[in-house]
Amino acid sequence: ISNKRVGIDIEEISKKPLKLSSKFISKENHLNLTKEKATLIWCCKEAIFKWHQRGNINFVNDIKISSFFIQKKGKILAEFNKSNYTLHYQKINTHFLVYVCK
């Protein structure tokens, strides 16, 4: 058991996050957005939200995801509440698994 907090999310890659992307991705980050990328960004923001364990988060403005290239597994950097986070992800068949531990 870890003495650190953990946030984890798993999502099926689908068109739904792409359709809802304006609710969690800023307008300037919509360029070249695919269903895979939108799903992975949603997963990252959900993992941070679950790590935070409190409400009142604006997914567009409060959680910033750095640029990334999708691979089978990797790390994505994010900023939340003026702190940096490293999110670990893995593509498992048609799903993304993302977790943060801090």
Which residue stretches match the model-derived regions?
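Core catalytic alpha/beta fold that binds nucleotide/phospho-ligands
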Residues: 1-102
